UniProtKB/Swiss-Prot annotation:
Classification via Gene3D superfamilies: Ribosomal protein L31
Subunit-level organization: Part of the 50S ribosomal subunit.
Cross-referenced InterPro entries: Ribosomal_bL28/bL31-like_sf (IPR034704), Ribosomal_bL31 (IPR002150), Ribosomal_bL31_B (IPR027493), Ribosomal_bL31_sf (IPR042105)
Keywords for this protein: Ribonucleoprotein, Ribosomal protein
Gene Ontology, cellular component aspect: ribonucleoprotein complex; ribosome
Stated name of the protein: Large ribosomal subunit protein bL31B
GO molecular function annotations of the record: structural constituent of ribosome
Gene: rpmE2
GO biological process assignments: translation
């Protein structure tokens, strides 16, 4: 491999925003936020959907609190249903 062209690989904590579940995985992402997890400090990456909240993996429907693009547009421009 050539030196200096590959991104740094590190362990990060991914946190599901819908359920609050956390898991450690390797990534090249470089988030600004950090978190204390299992006695060590890791960079934190927040995700809207993970295997903990996705209906395919859970087998049941869960409703996430995140607004979609249409709701954000309607809030911004004051449109009502």
């Amino acid at each position: 491999m050539k030196q200096g062209i590959h991104p740094d690989f590190q362990k990060v904590v991914f946190m599901d925003s819908a359920t609050g579940a956390k898991f450690v995985a390797g990534s090249t992402m470089k988030p600004e936020e950090t978190i204390e997890y299992e006695g060590e400090t890791y960079p934190l990456v927040r995700v809207e959907v993970s295997s903990d909240s996705h209906p395919f993996y859970t087998g049941k429907q869960k409703f996430a609190q995140a607004d979609g693009r249409i709701e954000k547009f309607n809030k911004k421009y004051g449109l009502k249903k």
